[in-house]
Amino acid sequence: MSPQTETKASVGFKAGVKEYKLAYYTPEYETKDTDILAAFRVTPQPGVPPEEAGAAVAAESSTGTWTTVWTDGLTSLDRYKGRCYHIEPVPGETDQYICYVAYPLDLFEEGSVTNMFTSIVGNAFGFKALRALRLEDLRISPAYIKTFQGPPHGIQVERDKLNKYGRPLLGCTIKPKLGLSAKNYGRACYECLRGGLDFTKDDENVNSQPFMRWRDRFLFCAEAIYKSQAETGEIKGHYLNATAGTCEEMMKRAVFARELGVPIIMHDYLTGGFTANTSLAHYCRDNGLLLHIHRAMHAVIDRQKNHGIHFRVLAKALRMSGGDHIHSGTVVGKLEGERDITLGFVDLLRDDFIEKDRSRGIYFTQDWVSLPGVIPVASGGIHVWHMPALTEIFGDDSVLQFGGGTLGHPWGNAPGAVANRVALEACVKARNEGRDLAQEGNEIIHEACKWSPELAAACEVWREIVFNFAAVDVLDK
């Protein structure tokens, strides 16, 4: 070894293991407008200080590793490393902390949700020094957002395509979700659309199974759309699920849907993956298709309060990757969804600028810099008695989707659709007249029953159906 090499080694590199907090905990750091900011709920192992735990998350999700390496000297760690810049205890918890981490923009590939998540949540969640770790929120910088196309069309363009204004849209998931032949499936779609719904929907696991291959389903559903449009004079749609085992097969199904002239297709974005979803969103914009997104598998990731990724992060990621609709919970139905939290990420989906509001679980102010909005879809265990609450909670820019609440009507599918449409129109009319849907909802529905026997029958069937279970994911008090 030459003297020159010996001098460089002794000055620039010292082997060994250092505490993460020496390099990655920087409370004096002032965040930049271009930084991507993350709020992690950290539960350290006993004996691990929160500063070390937060710094470990910052290190393992950016430039750090478990030991000092000589190649650190070949780059500028100060330019590229993540920094834990603030830590606060979680109210009511003795061993949990919110650790805020800032990531330089250059760590991420432009226009790639896949790369963003691979960095931020790809490795740190298995770190032994942590008992649990949850990504609560992200602040996506405007500079990074501008590298994404986002939703294929957005809320206003969708309304213009459908020529439907001033009310929520109505949908129905066809049940049973598995087992119907393509012809019977198409028949159910036609009956629901003819009865007054705007959309019918493939369930998330309807792809191309032996009992109903995708091409047959697409053809019969397209027939249902055109027949119901001719009879009602309204534009109709069916969410044709293009999700497949390969991206090539997915795109083939999307192309066939476009050739049929249908207005909307569907993708399961978490099981299908962000790369596939972004590719499909680009195709949909280029070819005039709306894109409905199902969040199948989300509860595996977001249900636990102290570990995983909160759905508000998955919702932001979807807006970046691309989708015109996404399921968002109902607040009042059978699926998890606390009101303030749900409305927090509903605003993150729809609005252009959202202020920080910890009372709704929003950790950062988010500016979407004109990225199109996404329509939230309320679906899961809802029926006509829920209509006033759903209209009041979600407002006009939403899809209210009744599966069993349409197809379970005692008189059949079309009367079930009629009941839902009448209930919705009654609620919108009452709201526009200044009535309080939260206080007068049942009275409004009862009044509408007098001139709609279909609604009266639905109200009788579901008058005692409730889902009274405590939410798991609640705000910290």
UniProtKB/Swiss-Prot annotation:
Its PTM note reads: The disulfide bond which can form in the large chain dimeric partners within the hexadecamer appears to be associated with oxidative stress and protein turnover.
The UniProt catalytic activity note for this protein reads: 2 (2R)-3-phosphoglycerate + 2 H(+) = D-ribulose 1,5-bisphosphate + CO2 + H2O; D-ribulose 1,5-bisphosphate + O2 = 2-phosphoglycolate + (2R)-3-phosphoglycerate + 2 H(+)
* Alphabetical list of Pfam families matching this protein: RuBisCO_large, RuBisCO_large_N
Q: Give the main localization category.
A: plastid
GO cellular-component term (any): plastid
List, from the UniProt record, the residues annotated as the active site of this protein: 175 (proton acceptor), 294 (proton acceptor)
Positions bearing N-acetylproline: 3
Query: A biological process (GO) annotation for this entry?
Result: carbon fixation
Q: Where is this site: Transition state stabilizer?
A: 334
Q: Keywords, A to Z?
A: Acetylation, Calvin cycle, Carbon dioxide fixation, Disulfide bond, Lyase, Magnesium, Metal-binding, Methylation, Monooxygenase, Oxidoreductase, Photorespiration, Plastid
Binding positions for substrate?
123, 173, 177, 295, 327, 379
Which EC main class describes this enzyme? lyase
Miscellaneous section:
The basic functional RuBisCO is composed of a large chain homodimer in a 'head-to-tail' conformation. In form I RuBisCO this homodimer is arranged in a barrel-like tetramer with the small subunits forming a tetrameric 'cap' on each end of the 'barrel'.
What PANTHER family does UniProt report for this protein, alphabetically? RIBULOSE BISPHOSPHATE CARBOXYLASE (PTHR42704), RIBULOSE BISPHOSPHATE CARBOXYLASE LARGE CHAIN (PTHR42704:SF16)
Q: What is this protein called?
A: Ribulose bisphosphate carboxylase large chain
Which species does this protein come from? Lathraea clandestina
